[in-house]
Amino acid sequence: MIRTKLSKVKEIRTPHGKKVRWLISKEMGAPRFEMRHFTITDESQPSEEAHPWEHQVYILSGEGIIKSGDTEIKVESGDAIYIAPNEPHLVQNLPQQKFTFLCIIPAGCEDRVKE
């Protein structure tokens, strides 16, 4: 069993100003999945991304927008989202909203922000 506490995990800023904390990772002994906690504020710059792995996202607080191609959905606390491998996507907060969510990805993904 692995246990972590959000307040004890180092916060890292992505190049676009998102704040991420790696709650569970391969380095901690999780062989198949990793869990990240994201915070997006008005200081963050939205950027479209696509990765060869799937994402599962659970919205904790605030409201935001998730865009994929021509589809744009408003999301809020309690929503769960699946993003397929290689699906272009953009996640952003609504103005003046602190937006937090969990993102679950397969363990060992290559191009990730970690320090």
Question: Residues of each region from the PLM?
Answer:
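Conserved short histidine dyad/triad with adjacent acidic residue
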Residues: 21, 36-51
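Ligand-binding loop in jelly-roll beta-barrel domains
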Residues: 85-111
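Short beta-strand His + acidic residue motifs that chelate non-heme Fe in jelly-roll/DSBH
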Residues: 46-48, 66-67, 83, 89-95
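Short acidic-glycine-tyrosine-enriched beta hairpin
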Residues: 71-85
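A short, N-terminal "cap"/entry segment at the start of jelly-roll beta-barrel domains
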Residues: 1-32, 113-115
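Structural motif
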Residues: 56, 63-65, 72, 88, ...
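Short, conserved beta-strand element in jelly-roll/cupin
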Residues: 39-40, 51-66, 104
